[in-house]
Amino acid sequence: AWMDIVASGSKYGRNILLLGNHSESAELTDKLRKKAAEKYVEKKISVPFEIPFTTLNKLSITLFNNAYYMKARSKTDFQHYDKYFYPLDFILNWNHIYSKSGLIQYQLNIPEEAGKDAVDKVLKKVVASGGGSFLAVLKKMGDQDGILSFPFKGYTLSMDFPVKKGIIEMCKELDAIVLDHGGRTYLTK
Protein backbone atom coordinates (compact mmCIF):
# COMPACT_ATOMS: atom_id res chain seq x y z
CA ALA A 1 0.00 0.00 0.00
CA TRP A 2 1.14 3.52 -0.78
CA MET A 3 0.67 5.75 2.25
CA ASP A 4 0.36 9.49 2.65
CA ILE A 5 2.40 10.09 5.80
CA VAL A 6 2.18 13.86 5.70
CA ALA A 7 -1.61 14.04 5.94
CA SER A 8 -3.26 14.83 9.24
CA GLY A 9 -6.79 15.37 10.51
CA SER A 10 -9.46 13.60 8.48
CA LYS A 11 -6.85 12.59 5.85
CA TYR A 12 -4.53 10.93 8.40
CA GLY A 13 -3.54 7.41 7.35
CA ARG A 14 -5.01 7.58 3.87
CA ASN A 15 -3.52 5.07 1.49
CA ILE A 16 -3.89 3.24 -1.78
CA LEU A 17 -4.07 -0.54 -1.48
CA LEU A 18 -2.69 -2.47 -4.44
CA LEU A 19 -3.76 -6.08 -4.93
CA GLY A 20 -2.71 -8.32 -7.78
CA ASN A 21 -3.33 -11.77 -9.19
CA HIS A 22 -1.27 -13.73 -11.68
CA SER A 23 -3.22 -14.22 -14.91
CA GLU A 24 -3.18 -17.39 -16.95
CA SER A 25 -3.34 -16.99 -20.72
CA ALA A 26 -6.70 -18.80 -20.88
CA GLU A 27 -8.24 -16.19 -18.55
CA LEU A 28 -7.44 -13.30 -20.88
CA THR A 29 -9.44 -11.79 -23.70
CA ASP A 30 -7.85 -11.90 -27.16
CA LYS A 31 -6.86 -8.23 -26.81
CA LEU A 32 -5.18 -8.79 -23.43
CA ARG A 33 -3.49 -11.98 -24.64
CA LYS A 34 -1.96 -9.99 -27.51
CA LYS A 35 -0.86 -7.27 -25.09
CA ALA A 36 0.73 -9.88 -22.81
CA ALA A 37 2.70 -11.35 -25.72
CA GLU A 38 4.23 -7.98 -26.63
CA LYS A 39 7.68 -7.17 -25.32
CA TYR A 40 7.28 -5.01 -22.23
CA VAL A 41 9.06 -1.68 -22.59
CA GLU A 42 8.28 0.91 -20.00
CA LYS A 43 8.54 4.59 -20.80
CA LYS A 44 11.09 6.09 -18.46
CA ILE A 45 11.68 9.60 -17.26
CA SER A 46 14.89 10.89 -15.76
CA VAL A 47 15.94 13.51 -13.26
CA PRO A 48 19.00 14.53 -15.30
CA PHE A 49 20.93 16.45 -12.66
CA GLU A 50 21.18 16.92 -8.93
CA ILE A 51 18.89 19.71 -7.86
CA PRO A 52 21.06 22.23 -5.94
CA PHE A 53 18.50 22.73 -3.17
CA THR A 54 15.91 20.46 -1.67
CA THR A 55 12.56 20.72 -3.40
CA LEU A 56 11.06 18.26 -0.97
CA ASN A 57 9.28 19.99 1.85
CA LYS A 58 5.91 19.63 3.51
CA LEU A 59 4.20 21.73 0.83
CA SER A 60 5.67 19.90 -2.20
CA ILE A 61 5.10 16.48 -0.64
CA THR A 62 1.51 17.42 0.28
CA LEU A 63 0.82 18.62 -3.27
CA PHE A 64 2.28 15.44 -4.79
CA ASN A 65 0.39 13.19 -2.35
CA ASN A 66 -2.92 14.97 -3.01
CA ALA A 67 -2.46 14.61 -6.78
CA TYR A 68 -1.37 10.96 -6.50
CA TYR A 69 -4.30 10.11 -4.22
CA MET A 70 -6.84 11.90 -6.44
CA LYS A 71 -5.49 10.14 -9.56
CA ALA A 72 -5.88 6.74 -7.94
CA ARG A 73 -9.29 5.16 -8.14
CA SER A 74 -10.74 1.74 -7.64
CA LYS A 75 -10.11 -0.08 -10.87
CA THR A 76 -9.13 -3.36 -12.39
CA ASP A 77 -6.13 -3.24 -14.67
CA PHE A 78 -3.93 -5.64 -16.58
CA GLN A 79 -0.24 -4.83 -16.31
CA HIS A 80 3.17 -6.37 -16.62
CA TYR A 81 4.63 -7.77 -13.40
CA ASP A 82 7.58 -5.34 -13.57
CA LYS A 83 5.23 -2.36 -13.43
CA TYR A 84 3.28 -3.95 -10.57
CA PHE A 85 6.22 -4.99 -8.39
CA TYR A 86 8.49 -2.04 -9.21
CA PRO A 87 6.14 0.90 -9.82
CA LEU A 88 8.80 3.59 -9.38
CA ASP A 89 11.47 2.09 -11.62
CA PHE A 90 10.31 4.29 -14.49
CA ILE A 91 12.01 7.26 -12.77
CA LEU A 92 15.75 7.18 -13.42
CA ASN A 93 18.12 9.00 -11.06
CA TRP A 94 15.24 9.64 -8.64
CA ASN A 95 17.73 10.31 -5.85
CA HIS A 96 18.63 13.62 -7.54
CA ILE A 97 15.41 15.19 -6.22
CA TYR A 98 16.87 15.02 -2.71
CA SER A 99 19.69 17.49 -3.55
CA LYS A 100 23.27 17.08 -2.39
CA SER A 101 22.05 16.70 1.19
CA GLY A 102 20.73 13.26 0.26
CA LEU A 103 18.15 11.08 1.93
CA ILE A 104 17.67 8.51 4.63
CA GLN A 105 15.80 5.37 3.66
CA TYR A 106 14.13 4.09 6.81
CA GLN A 107 12.55 0.63 6.82
CA LEU A 108 11.03 -1.14 9.78
CA ASN A 109 9.49 -4.56 10.35
CA ILE A 110 6.87 -5.01 13.08
CA PRO A 111 5.32 -8.28 14.30
CA GLU A 112 1.81 -8.84 12.96
CA GLU A 113 0.11 -8.59 16.36
CA ALA A 114 1.74 -5.20 17.10
CA GLY A 115 1.34 -3.85 13.57
CA LYS A 116 -1.61 -1.50 13.92
CA ASP A 117 -0.41 0.15 17.13
CA ALA A 118 3.22 0.46 16.04
CA VAL A 119 2.50 1.79 12.56
CA ASP A 120 0.03 4.29 14.02
CA LYS A 121 2.65 5.56 16.49
CA VAL A 122 5.30 5.78 13.77
CA LEU A 123 2.98 7.71 11.44
CA LYS A 124 1.95 10.11 14.21
CA LYS A 125 5.61 10.73 15.07
CA VAL A 126 6.47 11.45 11.42
CA VAL A 127 3.46 13.77 10.98
CA ALA A 128 4.24 15.61 14.24
CA SER A 129 7.89 16.07 13.28
CA GLY A 130 7.07 17.44 9.84
CA GLY A 131 9.46 14.80 8.52
CA GLY A 132 7.20 13.79 5.66
CA SER A 133 8.25 11.19 3.14
CA PHE A 134 7.82 11.50 -0.61
CA LEU A 135 7.54 7.74 -0.69
CA ALA A 136 6.04 5.48 1.96
CA VAL A 137 5.16 1.85 1.30
CA LEU A 138 3.50 -0.58 3.72
CA LYS A 139 3.64 -4.32 3.01
CA LYS A 140 2.45 -7.42 4.82
CA MET A 141 5.27 -9.95 5.16
CA GLY A 142 5.09 -13.73 5.36
CA ASP A 143 7.15 -16.10 7.47
CA GLN A 144 10.90 -15.55 7.80
CA ASP A 145 12.78 -17.95 5.53
CA GLY A 146 16.43 -17.42 6.40
CA ILE A 147 18.23 -17.05 9.70
CA LEU A 148 19.86 -13.81 8.55
CA SER A 149 16.97 -12.35 6.55
CA PHE A 150 15.51 -9.02 7.62
CA PRO A 151 11.78 -9.59 7.19
CA PHE A 152 9.64 -11.71 9.47
CA LYS A 153 5.89 -12.25 9.65
CA GLY A 154 4.26 -8.89 10.17
CA TYR A 155 4.38 -5.51 8.49
CA THR A 156 7.17 -3.54 6.91
CA LEU A 157 7.02 0.20 6.34
CA SER A 158 9.60 1.91 4.12
CA MET A 159 10.02 5.69 4.03
CA ASP A 160 12.46 8.06 2.30
CA PHE A 161 13.28 11.23 4.25
CA PRO A 162 15.27 14.20 2.95
CA VAL A 163 18.29 14.86 5.16
CA LYS A 164 17.59 17.99 7.16
CA LYS A 165 17.84 19.32 10.68
CA GLY A 166 16.16 17.02 13.20
CA ILE A 167 15.92 13.95 10.94
CA ILE A 168 18.44 11.87 12.92
CA GLU A 169 16.59 12.60 16.17
CA MET A 170 13.27 11.62 14.55
CA CYS A 171 14.79 8.34 13.31
CA LYS A 172 16.02 7.58 16.83
CA GLU A 173 12.47 8.14 18.12
CA LEU A 174 11.16 5.80 15.42
CA ASP A 175 13.79 3.23 16.46
CA ALA A 176 12.46 3.36 20.04
CA ILE A 177 8.88 2.75 18.85
CA VAL A 178 10.01 -0.17 16.69
CA LEU A 179 12.00 -1.76 19.53
CA ASP A 180 9.14 -1.26 22.02
CA HIS A 181 6.91 -3.31 19.69
CA GLY A 182 9.37 -6.16 19.12
CA GLY A 183 10.37 -4.99 15.66
CA ARG A 184 13.59 -4.27 13.84
CA THR A 185 14.99 -1.71 11.44
CA TYR A 186 16.75 -2.52 8.20
CA LEU A 187 20.31 -1.37 8.79
CA THR A 188 21.62 -1.75 5.25
CA LYS A 189 19.36 0.86 3.68
Language-model segments: which ranges?
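Noncatalytic alpha-helical scaffold of FAD-dependent oxidoreductases
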Residues: 1-189
